Design a protein with these regions (language model features):
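Glycine-rich phosphate/cofactor-binding loops in nucleotide/flavin-utilizing enzymes
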Residues: 2, 70, 74-75, 93, ...
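Glycine-rich beta->alpha junctions and the first turn(s) of the following alpha-helix
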Residues: 3-5, 195-292, 365, 381
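Active-site beta-strand/loop segments that form the cofactor-binding cradle
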Residues: 24-88, 116, 124-129, 153-155, ...
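C-terminal helix-coil-helix/basic helical segment that borders enzyme active sites and/or dimer interfaces
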Residues: 28-35, 264, 268-273, 277, ...
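Internal helix-loop-helix
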Residues: 50-117, 159-165, 290, 304-312, ...
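Hydrophobic, small-residue-rich alpha-helical packing segments that form membrane-like cores
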Residues: 130-133, 148
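A structural signal for short hydrophobic beta-strand segments in well-ordered beta-sheet cores
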Residues: 139-142
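A short core secondary-structure module
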Residues: 146-147, 151-196
Length: 392
């Protein structure tokens, strides 16, 4: 494992930094803040697609640049630092599943549109009674001629308001044991009659949705992979999602740089905050945690280039990185004091309120893609060889 950037990675980082600097004007940044929909968001995504960035790590035969995962990580890091909105679920989780396990027909239809920034997915997994124990999901899909009729409801269907399709897990065999063997993945057109959603507002201001399926008819040809083979797709998709969620840790570096600048410029009790031993200790711990996360991210990217991500390490990385962001935000809020807790638009808000906003937003990442408790179970089972158990 090479822990320093190669010349190619350094060149890519410089290119991306310059590109994002011109793409993300202050007006576009404000219009797309926390918004995974709307005209400006779609305009930015299409521009990214037109310029060839959305399929950076895909094989060339599917319209990608064929770059390794390490260079794709460079892309995500620079995008996070520049606050570029990305259709993360679509390009980083659904598309890799289609490339690895999708039919030729699905690849031909979906991948070019995803690469162009013209088609977006939402994920339909979690239900009110099936989150951590996803295999117990109740949403049903019953064969009727050439279609399946889907009934049920989902929760935490993020980006449903902007999605063209939903990557939906539904039960196609009610009797099989164990129950995860009776699940299939459907690609549901969001314009299909009977599909609807209502918004859920989270503490961080990020929108999610509850979604509903009332006799939604989906062609049998829109099953991804094999009938009753959805669990393999789910686990593959979640491993990619966990890797991607881990990569958001680079957000902490931008906040650290701004917090350090604030501490250098702010005087309390006749001394700059940065000269206070307690502030130095807190900022040093932030740096240490973020640097550890960065190295783990690069190991994960290296694993992806070597094959499928190790489920134990992917789970460990996801748990560590999402909890690490909360921890470092708390430390930086201690350094900034009361001013750090003021919201955006408030007079005297440190970092223009961005630190406070990020602290609220990053909470959701601890359970998106699998709650931290389950991540630890997976580490114990696949990494330490311990016996798995049912939470029922």
């Amino acid at each position: 494992m090479h822990v320093d950037h190669t010349d190619s990675q350094k060149a890519l980082r410089r290119e991306l930094r310059a590109y994002f600097s011109s793409l993300m004007t202050p007006e576009i940044r404000e219009a797309t803040r926390g918004n995974e929909g709307g005209a400006t968001y779609k305009q930015v995504i299409r521009q990214l697609g037109k310029d060839g960035w959305l399929a950076l790590g895909w094989p060339k035969e599917y319209g990608g640049q064929g770059r390794p995962s390490t260079e794709q990580l460079v892309f995500f890091e620079e995008a996070q630092l520049a606050e570029v909105p990305l259709p993360f679920v679509t390009i980083s989780t659904v598309a890799p599943c289609l490339i690895a396990l999708g039919s030729d027909e699905h690849k031909r239809f979906f991948l070019p549109k995803i690469a162009a920034g013209e088609l977006h997915f939402a994920i339909g997994y979690t239900e009110p009674g099936a989150g951590t124990d996803l295999a117990s999901l109740k949403t049903s899909a019953v064969r009727d001629g050439n279609d399946y009729v889907i009934n049920g409801n989902k929760i935490w269907t993020s980006s449903a308001e902007a999605a063209d399709y939903v990557w939906l897990a539904a039960r196609t065999d009610q009797d099989v044991k164990p129950p995860h063997k009776g699940i299939s993945i459907f690609m549901v057109d969001a314009k299909t009659p009977g599909f609807s959603f209502t918004p859920i507002r989270t503490v961080g201001g990020v929108r999610s949705n509850a979604s509903y399926y009332d006799n939604v008819r989906v062609p049998a040809s829109m099953i991804a992979g094999e009938l009753n083979g959805g669990w393999k797709l789910i686990t593959s998709q979640l491993n990619h999602e966990r890797v991607g969620l881990a990569a958001i840790g680079v957000q902490g570096w931008g906040l650290l740089a701004r917090t350090l600048k604030w501490a250098q410029d702010t005087v309390v009790g006749g001394k700059r905050v940065v000269e206070q031993p307690w502030a130095q200790s807190a900022l040093a711990e932030v740096y240490t945690r973020l640097e550890a996360m960065r190295l783990m991210n690069w190991r994960m990217a290296w694993q992806l280039d070597s094959g499928e991500p190790d489920p134990a390490f992917a789970s460990a990385m996801k748990a560590y990185s999402t909890e690490c962001l909360i921890a470092v935000d708390k430390l930086m809020l201690e350094v900034t004091g009361m001013a750090g807790g003021y919201r955006r638009g408030s007079p005297g808000a440190a970092l223009a309120g961005d630190l406070e906003e990020h602290y609220r937003k990053c909470q959701i990442n601890t359970f998106g893609g699998g709650v931290a408790e389950v991540m630890r179970d997976l580490v114990a089972q696949f990494g330490l060889g311990m016996t798995g158990y049912s939470r029922r």
